[in-house]
A protein has these predicted regions:
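C-terminal engagement/docking regions of AAA+ P-loop ATPases
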Residues: 1-15, 249-333
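Short glycine-rich substrate-engagement loop in P-loop NTPases that contacts/grips substrate
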Residues: 87-116
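Conserved AAA+ ATPase core "coupling" helix
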Residues: 89, 93, 169-224, 232-242
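AAA+/SF3 P-loop NTPase mechanochemical coupling elements
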Residues: 106-115, 144-161, 172-182
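Conserved AAA+/SF3 P-loop NTPase catalytic/coupling segment centered on the Walker-B
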Residues: 111-138, 152, 167-176, 188-196
């Protein structure tokens, strides 16, 4: 549907009003989480775009604290699943257990039945457990016995991977990684931020409490409104050019990338770039998408969707280098 300039102006005003809770949310979580603004914003983008986020970072970077604080600020149910090699699918989604008193099988729901789920070290569990979680993420429902149970909304899975430890891990296949809207690399805090973290943890035994500052209804309305954000055809073509340049680099004067890319982004990459760009616009209180929204989220959306050749590894070329080259060459509308 084509929007007039007046329609876009009205939508912009509406989003400026409806997105006011973002500032409250950031301020409240900042009382507990020092730094990590990029991670929090990416979680909010995942939440607004109805996607899930894969985080990669060493232990101790406040991944658990961030998603737990976010759930408390929204008064949502939080669940943490520690993935281990002996975990079973039933430990994640639940199972049917026999009740001797009632002489019947009853449902025991697993930790997947929550609004915010931290799937900690997802690459430590066998493939069948990963598959059970990812299927629930995709379908947003779980089948136990003969019955199907819808998962609660909002529903956000934050899966973590440790980039350092490879022994005893089951790497997520590319097809499974593709189900996450973003893969976010978590970095260390700055020296100043870490100084505040030290003081906060040394001076008090009790961590600050996060209060509810946003209602579930506001989140639901924000998700619906995010879908309505205007995206011009020029921005759509910009997204398509970025993704197509990862598939056919030679058509975009990027011949040097052809021997380095094993496979480019799938159509899901284009869809998720558009969804994440709209959510990024919402966070910036805009009713329309600009190219900078696309550029800001492109690495997080694309880094787990591109495959590199052995030649790229031999030349020390990583996915970020490829994306940088693509963004540099593709003309900004």
């Amino acid at each position: 549907m084509l929007l007039t300039a007046d329609d876009i102006r009205q939508l912009n005003d509406k989003i400026q009003y409806q997105s006011a809770f973002i500032d409250r949310l950031r301020d409240e979580t900042a009382r507990v989480i020092i730094g990590q603004h990029h991670m929090l914003d990416r979680l909010l983008i995942g939440l607004l775009s109805n996607g899930h986020v894969l985080l990669e970072g060493v232990p101790g970077l406040a991944k658990t604290l961030t998603i737990k604080s976010l759930s408390q600020a929204i008064h949502a149910k939080f669940s943490r699943i520690q993935f281990t090699p002996d975990l079973l699918p039933a430990d994640v989604i639940g199972t049917m257990i026999y009740n001797q008193q009632k002489n019947e099988f009853v449902v025991r729901r697993g930790p997947i039945f929550a609004n915010f789920i931290l799937a900690d070290e997802i690459n430590r569990a066998p493939a069948k457990v990963q598959s059970a979680l990812l299927e629930a993420m995709q379908e947003r429902q779980v089948t136990l016995g003969d019955s199907t149970y819808k998962l609660d909304e909002p529903f956000l899975v934050l899966a973590t991977q440790n980039p350092l430890e490879q022994e005893g891990t089951y790497p997520l296949p590319e097809a499974q990684q593709d189900r996450f809207i973003m893969k976010v690399i978590i970095d260390y805090p700055t020296k100043q931020e870490e100084q505040i973290i030290i003081r906060q943890n040394v001076q008090s035994l009790k961590s600050p409490e996060v209060s509810q500052v946003v209602s579930m209804q506001e989140i639901t309305q924000a998700k619906d409104l995010t879908r309505q954000i205007y995206m011009d055809e020029k921005v759509e073509n910009y997204i398509l050019d970025i993704v197509f340049a990862t598939r056919f680099p030679e058509k975009y004067k990027l011949e040097k990338l052809k021997p380095l890319i094993a496979y480019g982004g799938s159509p899901r990459a284009s869809i998720n770039l558009a969804l994440a760009a709209k959510a990024h616009a919402f966070l910036n209180k805009r009713g329309f998408v600009i190219p900078e929204d696309v550029r800001s989220i492109s690495k997080d959306v694309l880094r787990h969707r591109l495959g590199l050749t052995y030649e790229a590894e031999a030349e020390n070329v990583n996915v970020e280098n490829i994306i940088d080259d693509v963004l540099r060459v593709i003309q900004v509308p």
